[in-house]
């Protein structure tokens, strides 16, 4: 059991240090963080579609969403300061929001495989073992998706971390595609500058068609 140091002053005016036992109760977390027979967290209120499936899009907190500045700029429009009234294709979701969705859904493992690794082009696949729930007839589901990061679709700073960018993009894509979330991840979009593009064109599997 952990101990806390406690100072006491005696009648003689000297100070002694006494070990004091701390009462520790770690039962609160495990008690709250449990899943029911349907595979849903007991301490979370889920939102459902008309067919009874979980509306994972509705489970995303507003703090994880922000306007897609590039979408508005490409159309000569001012980017709004809030997400109010915006459609899903006008939004981006932060990596933290995707991680929270994955946590709410439940998973047992995440596995990355490097498909291609070159100086200017890294492609990675991400396979996630999603935990059983009532939506999958109590069966675990393995879902896999992939993404790439190149000099042509990352910022000048991010070109130093192509492997990390590719892994994040693949993870984001796997989670949101499995959960049927059509908001593009902030990590997925092309953040390159025209001046930083290489002359050699790379094949991109980015969500360009979704952003249009």
Name each model-derived stretch.
Residues 2-212:
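Polyanion-binding surfaces on beta-sheet-dominated domains and ring/shell assemblies
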């Amino acid at each position: 059991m952990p101990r806390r140091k406690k100072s006491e002053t005696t009648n003689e005016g000297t100070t002694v240090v006494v070990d004091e036992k701390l009462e520790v109760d770690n039962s609160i977390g495990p008690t709250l963080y449990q899943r029911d027979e349907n595979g849903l967290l007991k301490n979370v209120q889920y939102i459902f579609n008309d067919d009874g499936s979980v509306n994972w899009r509705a489970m995303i907190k507003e703090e994880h969403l922000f306007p897609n500045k590039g979408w508005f700029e490409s159309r000569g429009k001012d980017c709004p300061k809030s997400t109010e009234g915006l459609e899903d294709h006008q939004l981006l979701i932060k990596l933290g929001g995707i991680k929270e969705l994955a946590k709410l859904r439940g998973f047992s493992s995440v596995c990355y495989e490097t498909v291609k690794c070159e100086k200017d082009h890294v492609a990675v696949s991400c396979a996630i073992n999603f935990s059983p729930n009532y939506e999958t007839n109590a069966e675990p589901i393995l879902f896999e998706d992939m993404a790439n990061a190149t000099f042509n679709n990352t910022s000048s700073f991010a070109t130093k971390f192509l492997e990390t960018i590719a892994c994040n993009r693949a993870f984001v894509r796997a989670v949101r595609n499995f959960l049927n979330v059509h908001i593009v991840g902030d990590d997925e979009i092309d953040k390159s500058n025209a001046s930083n593009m290489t002359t050699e064109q790379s094949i991109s599997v980015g969500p360009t068609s979704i952003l249009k």
